[in-house]
């Protein structure tokens, strides 16, 4: 990781296509348009530069409005959106990318992801081919996947010879994804975590709260720091400006190995989102 530390000055990580991405960003899943605009505005104001949305969230236009109103230069931003499952396919994925750009009011996205592999649908390889085209046309700087298994990624590489830059997956101490992180790394794919707080389920966990008290940090800050110290990039959602500021204040401390191990030891395979092996939605 490279870059300066600070309350919201997230370091950056270099992707396998040589583009760089902040290691910590704001997610806006399940936020209303008003909540999205307020959250994005608050995040940009404190120095956050990665904003993660998706067609399925229904708030790409709200993200675009907040970006336009912020005055932050486009080249300073890293904007991610995602391809919805009904839009999988070679041609439809390209059309969907252009439609997302229209809603965002942008000429390109920094990262375009296949939201779910949706194995029952059977179109994610075709969709990947279309995304390769979108990248070639300059509509997406980098392309990647979300919720993909190691086998899904190997299928893409074997059939298209193009490796995703990022695999965004559910990852928190209850689901530490050790094997998938190793598989991603073997293919030079950056692991980006979502639901790093397990939808709040870990905020009152005794192990988490005990460690937080030792560092005089919040449980959320400890959970985010754990994820970052594993070498992951992270997207964290919040609609509250004060919580957003707190979530980005995680670059001034480091967890000891014993505390990293204690948090990792909470792993029991619990998912708070759908199972990628069977899910065919979003």
Swiss-Prot record:
In this protein, the active site sits at 57 (proton donor)
Activity regulation behaviour: Inhibited by the antituberculosis drug isoniazid (INH).
InterPro entries listed in its UniProt record: AKR, Aldo/ket_reductase_CS, NADP_OxRdtase_dom, NADP_OxRdtase_dom_sf
Q: Which GO terms of the molecular function aspect are on file?
A: aldose reductase (NADPH) activity
Please give the superkingdom of this protein's source: Bacteria
Residues that bind NADPH, according to the entry? 197, 199, 235, 237-239, 243, 246-247, 273
**UniProt cross-references to Gene3D superfamilies, sorted A to Z:** NADP-dependent oxidoreductase domain
Q: Which UniProt keywords apply?
A: NADP, Oxidoreductase
> Which GO CC terms are listed, alphabetically?
cytosol; peptidoglycan-based cell wall; plasma membrane
Report the EC code(s) recorded for this entry: 1.1.1.-
Further remark, if any? Identified as a multidrug-resistant tuberculosis (MDRTB) immunogenic protein.
Q: Tell me the function of this protein.
A: Catalyzes the NADPH-dependent reduction of dicarbonyls. Exhibits narrow substrate specificity, with preferential activity against the dicarbonyl substrates methylglyoxal and phenylglyoxal. May play an important role in the detoxification of methylglyoxal.
What do we know about how this protein assembles, alone or with others? Monomer.
| Stated name of the protein | Aldo-keto reductase Rv2971
